[in-house]
Amino acid sequence: MKIPLYRHNYRGGHHIDLLQSGEPFFGAVEKLIDEAKHFIHFQTYLIDEDKTGIRIIDALIRAAKRGVRTYLLLDAYGTKYLSKELVDSIDDSGILFRFFSPAFVTNGFQLSLRLHLKVVMADGQTAIIGGMNFADRYHGTPSKKGWLDFAVVVRGPECVQLHA
């Protein structure tokens, strides 16, 4: 007997696009944040305090300031180098913000769960899901070696499951 590893009850009415590293990805994330009307759920492992990271954080702050309920979950280890000033500006913006699972040491062993999910979802209708973090080095431009990674943009009823 074969046991399927993945089972999915297909529902019509959704659309999926593939994004590659770099500007197609970061541009789509910024556009999704800028067009959100009701809420944004944003979680990632790493966001650097560089041009790319600040671009995305600024978009989240703009959304919160225009009244979009904005939730931000960052991995405590992957974002440990963010400055206190940047973290304070996120806190002060109205974004509902938390760090996931700070590492701790017990009996000489470090225990740490990491948040490697990268999900940006807006209004329960559109989500971007993938492996890319938010930093300049994830642009993967031909002139400079970078990460080559992918994400999918999902639109439609499948996003309801992400919101649940």
Regions found by a protein language model. Name each.
Residues 1:
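Cofactor-/ligand-binding subdomain signature composed of acidic, glycine-rich
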Residues 4-39, 43-164:
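HKD-type phospholipase D/PLD-like phosphodiesterase module
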